[in-house]
Amino acid sequence: MWLWEDQGGLLGPFSFLLLVLLLVTRSPVNACLLTGSLFVLLRVFSFEPVPSCRALQVLKPRDRISAIAHRGGSHDAPENTLAAIRQAAKNGATGVELDIEFTSDGIPVLMHDNTVDRTTDGTGRLCDLTFEQIRKLNPAANHRLRNDFPDEKIPTLREAVAECLNHNLTIFFDVKGHAHKATEALKKMYMEFPQLYNNSVVCSFLPEVIYKMRQTDRDVITALTHRPWSLSHTGDGKPRYDTFWKHFIFVMMDILLDWSMHNILWYLCGISAFLMQKDFVSPAYLKKWSAKGIQVVGWTVNTFDEKSYYESHLGSSYITDSMVEDCEPHF
Protein backbone atom coordinates (compact mmCIF):
# COMPACT_ATOMS: atom_id res chain seq x y z
CA MET A 1 0.00 0.00 0.00
CA TRP A 2 2.97 2.35 0.54
CA LEU A 3 3.11 2.88 -3.21
CA TRP A 4 -0.15 4.79 -3.16
CA GLU A 5 0.10 6.52 0.20
CA ASP A 6 -0.75 10.17 -0.13
CA GLN A 7 2.57 11.49 1.19
CA GLY A 8 4.96 8.75 0.24
CA GLY A 9 3.75 6.99 -2.88
CA LEU A 10 3.00 7.60 -6.54
CA LEU A 11 -0.71 8.43 -6.35
CA GLY A 12 -0.12 12.18 -6.53
CA PRO A 13 2.29 12.15 -9.50
CA PHE A 14 0.20 9.74 -11.55
CA SER A 15 -3.03 11.61 -10.76
CA PHE A 16 -1.34 14.75 -12.04
CA LEU A 17 -0.09 12.87 -15.10
CA LEU A 18 -3.59 11.54 -15.79
CA LEU A 19 -4.99 15.07 -15.63
CA VAL A 20 -2.35 16.36 -18.05
CA LEU A 21 -3.03 13.51 -20.48
CA LEU A 22 -6.76 14.15 -20.25
CA LEU A 23 -6.17 17.76 -21.24
CA VAL A 24 -3.83 16.77 -24.08
CA THR A 25 -5.72 13.80 -25.53
CA ARG A 26 -9.26 14.88 -24.55
CA SER A 27 -10.03 11.18 -24.29
CA PRO A 28 -10.56 9.54 -20.88
CA VAL A 29 -9.87 6.11 -22.37
CA ASN A 30 -6.59 7.11 -24.03
CA ALA A 31 -5.49 9.08 -20.97
CA CYS A 32 -6.13 6.10 -18.69
CA LEU A 33 -4.37 3.70 -21.06
CA LEU A 34 -1.31 5.94 -21.34
CA THR A 35 -1.16 6.53 -17.59
CA GLY A 36 -1.53 2.82 -16.87
CA SER A 37 1.14 1.93 -19.42
CA LEU A 38 3.59 4.42 -17.92
CA PHE A 39 2.93 3.05 -14.45
CA VAL A 40 3.56 -0.53 -15.60
CA LEU A 41 6.81 0.53 -17.30
CA LEU A 42 7.94 2.29 -14.13
CA ARG A 43 7.22 -0.79 -12.05
CA VAL A 44 9.01 -3.11 -14.49
CA PHE A 45 12.18 -1.03 -14.88
CA SER A 46 12.54 0.38 -11.36
CA PHE A 47 14.87 -0.98 -8.68
CA GLU A 48 14.02 -1.91 -5.13
CA PRO A 49 15.98 0.26 -2.68
CA VAL A 50 18.64 -1.22 -0.45
CA PRO A 51 17.08 -2.39 2.87
CA SER A 52 16.49 0.70 4.98
CA CYS A 53 18.24 -0.75 8.05
CA ARG A 54 21.52 -1.09 6.13
CA ALA A 55 21.12 2.30 4.46
CA LEU A 56 20.58 3.95 7.84
CA GLN A 57 23.75 2.35 9.21
CA VAL A 58 25.67 4.13 6.44
CA LEU A 59 23.78 7.44 6.34
CA LYS A 60 23.40 7.81 10.12
CA PRO A 61 26.02 5.57 11.72
CA ARG A 62 25.29 4.83 15.37
CA ASP A 63 21.99 6.68 14.79
CA ARG A 64 23.80 10.03 14.84
CA ILE A 65 23.75 12.97 12.46
CA SER A 66 26.60 12.79 9.96
CA ALA A 67 28.92 15.70 9.17
CA ILE A 68 30.42 14.98 5.75
CA ALA A 69 33.50 16.85 4.54
CA HIS A 70 32.85 18.23 1.04
CA ARG A 71 35.66 17.15 -1.32
CA GLY A 72 37.40 16.02 1.83
CA GLY A 73 36.92 19.45 3.43
CA SER A 74 38.08 21.85 0.73
CA HIS A 75 38.47 24.79 3.13
CA ASP A 76 40.61 22.89 5.62
CA ALA A 77 42.95 21.15 3.14
CA PRO A 78 43.50 20.87 -0.63
CA GLU A 79 40.31 19.34 -2.03
CA ASN A 80 40.14 15.73 -3.17
CA THR A 81 43.53 14.77 -1.74
CA LEU A 82 44.71 12.18 0.76
CA ALA A 83 45.70 15.06 3.04
CA ALA A 84 42.10 16.30 2.97
CA ILE A 85 40.84 12.84 3.94
CA ARG A 86 43.29 12.64 6.84
CA GLN A 87 42.44 16.18 7.95
CA ALA A 88 38.71 15.45 7.81
CA ALA A 89 39.18 12.43 10.06
CA LYS A 90 41.32 14.48 12.45
CA ASN A 91 38.66 17.22 12.56
CA GLY A 92 35.89 14.78 13.48
CA ALA A 93 34.08 14.25 10.17
CA THR A 94 31.80 11.24 9.92
CA GLY A 95 32.49 10.90 6.22
CA VAL A 96 33.89 12.55 3.11
CA GLU A 97 32.42 13.43 -0.27
CA LEU A 98 34.88 12.75 -3.10
CA ASP A 99 34.67 13.51 -6.83
CA ILE A 100 35.56 10.93 -9.47
CA GLU A 101 37.05 11.84 -12.84
CA PHE A 102 39.19 10.02 -15.43
CA THR A 103 42.54 10.66 -17.10
CA SER A 104 43.07 10.19 -20.83
CA ASP A 105 44.37 6.66 -20.20
CA GLY A 106 41.28 5.75 -18.19
CA ILE A 107 42.62 5.93 -14.63
CA PRO A 108 39.96 7.00 -12.09
CA VAL A 109 41.29 9.85 -9.94
CA LEU A 110 39.91 12.41 -7.52
CA MET A 111 39.09 15.68 -9.28
CA HIS A 112 36.03 17.94 -9.24
CA ASP A 113 36.55 19.92 -12.45
CA ASN A 114 37.10 18.61 -15.96
CA THR A 115 40.25 20.75 -16.13
CA VAL A 116 43.21 20.96 -13.75
CA ASP A 117 43.51 24.75 -13.90
CA ARG A 118 41.62 25.78 -10.75
CA THR A 119 43.23 23.45 -8.20
CA THR A 120 46.71 22.67 -9.54
CA ASP A 121 49.80 24.32 -11.03
CA GLY A 122 48.98 22.84 -14.44
CA THR A 123 46.57 23.61 -17.28
CA GLY A 124 44.41 21.60 -19.62
CA ARG A 125 41.52 19.21 -19.71
CA LEU A 126 41.82 16.11 -17.57
CA CYS A 127 40.67 13.93 -20.46
CA ASP A 128 43.70 15.13 -22.46
CA LEU A 129 46.25 14.32 -19.74
CA THR A 130 47.66 10.92 -18.85
CA PHE A 131 47.91 9.70 -15.29
CA GLU A 132 51.69 10.11 -15.45
CA GLN A 133 51.22 13.76 -16.43
CA ILE A 134 48.67 14.64 -13.76
CA ARG A 135 50.72 12.85 -11.10
CA LYS A 136 53.38 15.54 -11.55
CA LEU A 137 50.92 18.32 -10.72
CA ASN A 138 50.52 19.91 -7.29
CA PRO A 139 46.85 19.80 -6.16
CA ALA A 140 47.66 22.19 -3.30
CA ALA A 141 49.14 24.88 -5.55
CA ASN A 142 46.16 27.25 -5.36
CA HIS A 143 44.91 26.41 -1.87
CA ARG A 144 45.01 29.00 0.90
CA LEU A 145 47.06 26.58 3.07
CA ARG A 146 49.33 25.35 0.28
CA ASN A 147 52.48 25.80 2.35
CA ASP A 148 51.16 23.27 4.87
CA PHE A 149 50.78 20.59 2.18
CA PRO A 150 53.98 20.63 0.09
CA ASP A 151 54.05 17.02 -1.11
CA GLU A 152 50.50 16.25 -2.20
CA LYS A 153 49.69 14.37 -5.40
CA ILE A 154 46.39 13.84 -7.19
CA PRO A 155 45.29 10.46 -5.79
CA THR A 156 43.78 7.52 -7.60
CA LEU A 157 40.33 6.34 -6.62
CA ARG A 158 41.84 3.23 -5.05
CA GLU A 159 44.29 5.24 -2.93
CA ALA A 160 41.45 7.42 -1.69
CA VAL A 161 39.24 4.44 -0.82
CA ALA A 162 42.03 2.77 1.13
CA GLU A 163 42.75 6.00 3.04
CA CYS A 164 39.08 6.51 3.92
CA LEU A 165 38.66 2.95 5.13
CA ASN A 166 41.83 3.28 7.19
CA HIS A 167 40.19 6.20 9.01
CA ASN A 168 36.73 4.58 9.19
CA LEU A 169 35.13 7.36 7.14
CA THR A 170 31.91 6.93 5.20
CA ILE A 171 32.52 7.74 1.52
CA PHE A 172 30.11 9.66 -0.71
CA PHE A 173 31.32 8.98 -4.25
CA ASP A 174 30.20 11.95 -6.37
CA VAL A 175 30.02 11.00 -10.05
CA LYS A 176 29.81 13.92 -12.51
CA GLY A 177 29.43 11.84 -15.68
CA HIS A 178 30.99 8.93 -17.58
CA ALA A 179 28.22 6.65 -16.32
CA HIS A 180 29.64 3.45 -17.81
CA LYS A 181 33.29 4.06 -16.87
CA ALA A 182 32.43 5.31 -13.40
CA THR A 183 30.16 2.40 -12.51
CA GLU A 184 32.71 -0.12 -13.76
CA ALA A 185 35.48 1.56 -11.76
CA LEU A 186 33.31 1.66 -8.65
CA LYS A 187 32.25 -1.96 -9.08
CA LYS A 188 35.94 -2.93 -8.99
CA MET A 189 36.32 -0.99 -5.75
CA TYR A 190 33.35 -2.76 -4.18
CA MET A 191 34.75 -6.12 -5.24
CA GLU A 192 38.20 -5.34 -3.83
CA PHE A 193 36.87 -3.65 -0.68
CA PRO A 194 33.55 -5.37 0.17
CA GLN A 195 33.30 -3.31 3.37
CA LEU A 196 32.27 -0.43 1.09
CA TYR A 197 28.77 -1.93 0.91
CA ASN A 198 28.33 -0.86 4.52
CA ASN A 199 30.45 2.27 4.36
CA SER A 200 29.68 4.24 1.20
CA VAL A 201 27.10 5.95 -1.01
CA VAL A 202 27.24 6.60 -4.75
CA CYS A 203 25.63 9.95 -5.59
CA SER A 204 25.15 12.06 -8.70
CA PHE A 205 23.18 14.94 -10.18
CA LEU A 206 22.63 12.68 -13.19
CA PRO A 207 19.86 10.07 -12.79
CA GLU A 208 21.40 7.93 -15.55
CA VAL A 209 24.53 7.48 -13.43
CA ILE A 210 22.54 6.24 -10.44
CA TYR A 211 20.37 4.00 -12.62
CA LYS A 212 23.48 2.51 -14.24
CA MET A 213 25.04 1.92 -10.82
CA ARG A 214 21.94 0.06 -9.63
CA GLN A 215 22.02 -1.99 -12.85
CA THR A 216 25.65 -2.85 -12.22
CA ASP A 217 25.24 -3.69 -8.54
CA ARG A 218 21.88 -3.58 -6.75
CA ASP A 219 23.51 -3.81 -3.33
CA VAL A 220 25.18 -0.40 -3.59
CA ILE A 221 23.54 2.41 -1.60
CA THR A 222 22.78 5.36 -3.88
CA ALA A 223 21.56 8.95 -3.72
CA LEU A 224 20.36 11.56 -6.17
CA THR A 225 21.84 15.05 -5.80
CA HIS A 226 19.76 18.09 -6.68
CA ARG A 227 19.82 21.87 -6.72
CA PRO A 228 16.63 23.56 -7.97
CA TRP A 229 17.17 25.82 -10.99
CA SER A 230 20.59 24.29 -11.67
CA LEU A 231 20.04 24.18 -15.44
CA SER A 232 19.11 27.86 -15.73
CA HIS A 233 21.23 29.36 -12.93
CA THR A 234 24.78 28.94 -11.61
CA GLY A 235 25.54 27.95 -8.03
CA ASP A 236 25.61 31.59 -6.88
CA GLY A 237 22.17 32.28 -8.40
CA LYS A 238 23.21 34.08 -11.59
CA PRO A 239 21.38 33.23 -14.86
CA ARG A 240 23.43 31.02 -17.16
CA TYR A 241 22.02 32.52 -20.37
CA ASP A 242 21.58 36.13 -21.53
CA THR A 243 18.89 35.59 -24.15
CA PHE A 244 15.30 35.51 -22.88
CA TRP A 245 14.13 32.49 -24.83
CA LYS A 246 17.14 30.35 -23.98
CA HIS A 247 16.76 31.24 -20.32
CA PHE A 248 13.02 30.53 -20.47
CA ILE A 249 13.56 27.11 -22.07
CA PHE A 250 16.03 26.08 -19.37
CA VAL A 251 13.72 27.36 -16.62
CA MET A 252 11.00 25.08 -18.03
CA MET A 253 13.51 22.22 -18.11
CA ASP A 254 14.37 22.96 -14.48
CA ILE A 255 10.71 22.70 -13.51
CA LEU A 256 10.38 19.37 -15.33
CA LEU A 257 13.60 18.03 -13.79
CA ASP A 258 12.56 19.09 -10.29
CA TRP A 259 9.14 17.43 -10.66
CA SER A 260 10.72 14.27 -12.05
CA MET A 261 13.31 14.06 -9.28
CA HIS A 262 10.74 14.40 -6.52
CA ASN A 263 8.00 12.27 -8.06
CA ILE A 264 9.38 9.62 -10.43
CA LEU A 265 13.19 9.31 -10.57
CA TRP A 266 13.65 8.54 -6.87
CA TYR A 267 11.41 5.50 -7.32
CA LEU A 268 12.88 4.45 -10.67
CA CYS A 269 16.43 4.42 -9.28
CA GLY A 270 15.54 2.98 -5.87
CA ILE A 271 17.62 5.54 -3.99
CA SER A 272 18.23 5.57 -0.25
CA ALA A 273 19.09 9.27 0.14
CA PHE A 274 18.46 12.62 -1.50
CA LEU A 275 21.25 15.23 -1.38
CA MET A 276 19.54 18.64 -1.50
CA GLN A 277 20.92 22.17 -1.62
CA LYS A 278 20.73 23.43 1.97
CA ASP A 279 18.39 26.39 1.42
CA PHE A 280 15.54 24.13 0.31
CA VAL A 281 15.60 21.77 3.31
CA SER A 282 12.87 22.25 5.93
CA PRO A 283 11.00 20.09 8.46
CA ALA A 284 8.16 19.65 5.96
CA TYR A 285 10.63 18.69 3.24
CA LEU A 286 12.27 16.09 5.49
CA LYS A 287 8.84 14.69 6.39
CA LYS A 288 7.97 14.30 2.71
CA TRP A 289 11.06 12.22 2.01
CA SER A 290 10.84 10.31 5.27
CA ALA A 291 7.40 9.07 4.18
CA LYS A 292 9.17 7.49 1.22
CA GLY A 293 11.83 5.92 3.44
CA ILE A 294 14.54 8.25 2.15
CA GLN A 295 17.11 10.24 4.15
CA VAL A 296 17.89 13.86 3.22
CA VAL A 297 21.43 15.25 3.34
CA GLY A 298 21.83 19.02 3.00
CA TRP A 299 24.70 20.74 1.19
CA THR A 300 26.78 22.85 1.53
CA VAL A 301 26.31 23.81 5.21
CA ASN A 302 29.20 26.12 6.07
CA THR A 303 28.38 28.27 9.10
CA PHE A 304 28.06 27.45 12.78
CA ASP A 305 24.44 28.68 12.83
CA GLU A 306 23.50 26.53 9.84
CA LYS A 307 25.14 23.46 11.34
CA SER A 308 23.38 24.07 14.65
CA TYR A 309 20.05 24.36 12.80
CA TYR A 310 20.64 21.08 10.96
CA GLU A 311 21.76 19.25 14.08
CA SER A 312 19.33 20.62 16.68
CA HIS A 313 16.22 21.58 14.72
CA LEU A 314 16.18 19.46 11.57
CA GLY A 315 18.04 16.42 12.85
CA SER A 316 19.48 16.01 9.36
CA SER A 317 22.96 15.07 8.15
CA TYR A 318 24.86 17.64 6.10
CA ILE A 319 27.86 18.20 3.85
CA THR A 320 30.30 21.00 4.71
CA ASP A 321 33.44 22.60 3.29
CA SER A 322 34.95 23.01 6.76
CA MET A 323 34.80 21.04 9.97
CA VAL A 324 36.45 23.78 12.03
CA GLU A 325 35.23 27.25 11.00
CA ASP A 326 32.74 29.27 8.97
CA CYS A 327 33.57 29.65 5.29
CA GLU A 328 32.13 30.62 1.92
CA PRO A 329 30.59 27.88 -0.25
CA HIS A 330 32.79 26.19 -2.85
CA PHE A 331 30.73 25.65 -6.01
UniProtKB/Swiss-Prot annotation:
Xref: InterPro entries: GP_PDE_dom, PLC-like_Pdiesterase_TIM-brl
Broadest EC class assigned to this enzyme: hydrolase
Cytoplasmic domain ranges by topology: 1-3, 269-331
Enzyme Commission designation: 3.1.4.44, 3.1.4.-
Cysteines joined through disulfide linkages: none
Known tissue expression: Widely expressed.
Activity regulation remarks: Inhibited by EDTA, calcium chloride, and zinc chloride. Enhanced by magnesium chloride. Glycerophosphodiester phosphodiesterase activity can be modulated by G-protein signaling pathways.
Catalytic reaction(s) noted: sn-glycero-3-phospho-1D-myo-inositol + H2O = myo-inositol + sn-glycerol 3-phosphate + H(+); 1-O-(1Z-octadecenyl)-sn-glycero-3-phospho-(N-5Z,8Z,11Z,14Z-eicosatetraenoyl)-ethanolamine + H2O = 1-O-(1Z-octadecenyl)-sn-glycero-3-phosphate + N-(5Z,8Z,11Z,14Z-eicosatetraenoyl)-ethanolamine + H(+); 1-O-(1Z-octadecenyl)-sn-glycero-3-phospho-(N-9Z-octadecenoyl)-ethanolamine + H2O = 1-O-(1Z-octadecenyl)-sn-glycero-3-phosphate + N-(9Z-octadecenoyl) ethanolamine + H(+); 1-O-(1Z-octadecenyl)-sn-glycero-3-phospho-N-hexadecanoyl-ethanolamine + H2O = 1-O-(1Z-octadecenyl)-sn-glycero-3-phosphate + N-hexadecanoylethanolamine + H(+)
Record's comment on post-translational modification: N-glycosylated.
Pfam families assigned to the protein according to its UniProt record, in alphabetical order: GDPD
A GO BP annotation: lipid metabolic process
Listed SUPFAM superfamilies: PLC-like phosphodiesterases
Binding site for Mg(2+): 97, 99, 174
Localization (cell): Cell membrane; Cytoplasmic vesicle membrane
GO CC, one annotated term: cytoplasmic vesicle membrane
Residues carrying a glycan: 168, 198
Claim: Metal-binding is one of the keywords in the record: yes
Cofactor entry: Mg(2+)
Residues exposed to the Lumenal side: 25-247
Signal peptide boundaries: none
Predominant location: membrane
Keywords on record: Cell membrane, Cytoplasmic vesicle, Glycoprotein, Hydrolase, Lipid metabolism, Magnesium, Membrane, Metal-binding, Transmembrane, Transmembrane helix
Membrane-spanning intervals of the chain: 4-24, 248-268
Membrane topology, as annotated: Multi-pass membrane protein
Quaternary structure annotation from Swiss-Prot or TrEMBL: Interacts with PRAF2. Interacts with RGS16.
Protein name listed in UniProt: Glycerophosphodiester phosphodiesterase 1
Record organism: Homo sapiens
Gene: GDE1
